[in-house]
Amino acid sequence: YEIRLSLVGSEMCIRDSVHPVTGEVFSVAHGNAMIYKYDPEQNTMVATGVQLPDAAGKNASKVKIRCILFDKAGTTVYMSSQNKHVIYKGDYDMSKGEFSNLHIWVGQYDTKGFTEGQGNEAKLEEPCQMDLDEEGNIYVAVRKKHRIAKITPDGMLTNYTGTGLSGTTDGTLDKAQFNHPEGLQFGPDGALYISDYWNHKIRKIEKD
């Protein structure tokens, strides 16, 4: 590339996301947990004024967002924080271009572990990339626990596959093992593809 764009200047930005309907580009700065939006007229990312909350509902900081995921309608947004061990959820108004109701949806802020459960009763350690299936369930790579978790639309987290121990075993969902999975995405064939980081492999889970 001859021209490169610095998305958020001195604030470290790890992931961005393109809105599925409007084509808008968003990112979250690590330093102040602020959501940024690309302004084509200024050719730069500008702050929206919306910051992610911490456990007390105050403005968070040093939140390492690994995935920004919109639903197909573009009205709901999910964000995974690797270092705070939570999944955020919020609303997006396309007509106004505004986020609202951003809250910690699943997991416990700054608390490590892996516990199946509803919403903030659940625990997950280092959630990374996420994707949605046709029924609205979210699948998330839980890096530190070597698991792929499933979250239902009402916020129930369960283990989808992975034993919790690092390994490279193929097999059924209850026996397969991973080693720090970070990325995942559904392919056009309906299969779930997983970037298994320390195994240096792309794994595939066939569609049922």
Sequence positions of predicted segments:
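Gly/Pro-rich loop segments of beta-rich domains
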Residues: 4-6, 10-11, 15, 42-66, ...
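A short loop-to-beta-strand structural motif that recurs across blades of beta-propeller domains
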Residues: 33-37, 85-89, 146-150, 156, ...
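Conserved beta-propeller blade signature
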Residues: 24-27, 76-79, 137-140, 191-193
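Short loop/turn segments immediately following beta-strands, especially the blade-tip
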Residues: 38-45, 89-98, 206-208
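Short loop/turn segments immediately following the C-termini of beta-strands
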Residues: 30-31, 82-83, 92, 143, ...
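Residue-level detector of Asp-centered blade-edge/turn motifs that repeat once per structural unit
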Residues: 18-22, 70-74, 132-135, 186-189
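Blade-level signature of beta-propeller repeat domains, shared across WD40, Kelch, NHL, RCC1
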Residues: 180-208
